[in-house]
Every structure is written in structure tokens, then in C-alpha cells.
């Protein structure tokens, strides 16, 4: 059975989470999307193509919900 790279969800105040991702991992915020009126999904990428998915809550807390490696961005395809 595959094991998760994170044993549990890690939550911190949003400013501290941002600082952790930038300073410890060298990550930059690559994309965001609204998940609900109170939740924003953030995708962070580091220089080695590792990725971290974070949910930022309106309450001021952010939680790492997934991590992985070998991120690859795709260009939208023309449907025609």
C-alpha cells in the first residue's frame, strides 16, 4: 500500500504557512481557485517541481492537504 508523504493534515495561521512554504521549501504560489465562499485552494511549487496543495480558510488558518513531486503544467488545448 502506498504511504502518504504527509501523515496528517498540517494547519497553521495563514501568514505562518506562507512563510514556511517560502522559506523552508523555496516554494512560490503558482495557482489559486475558489473552493467555497470560505475556502481558497492554493497550489505551491518549489524549484525542484515538488508541489504542495493548501486550503486557506476565511478564518485565517491554512492547511496542507496534499503534497507530491514532478509537477507538470499543461497548456490548454484548442478544442477545434
Provide a role label for each language-model segment.
Residues 1-80:
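Polybasic/polar functional segments that serve as interface/processing modules
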Amino acid at each position: 500500500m502506498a504511504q502518504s508523504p504527509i501523515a496528517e493534515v498540517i494547519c497553521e495561521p495563514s501568514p505562518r504557512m506562507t512563510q514556511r512554504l517560502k522559506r523552508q521549501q523555496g516554494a512560490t504560489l503558482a495557482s489559486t481557485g475558489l473552493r467555497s465562499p470560505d475556502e481558497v485552494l492554493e497550489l505551491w511549487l518549489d524549484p525542484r517541481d515538488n508541489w504542495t496543495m493548501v486550503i486557506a480558510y476565511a478564518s485565517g488558518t491554512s492547511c496542507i492537504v496534499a503534497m507530491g513531486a514532478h509537477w507538470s503544467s499543461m497548456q490548454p488545448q484548442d478544442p477545434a
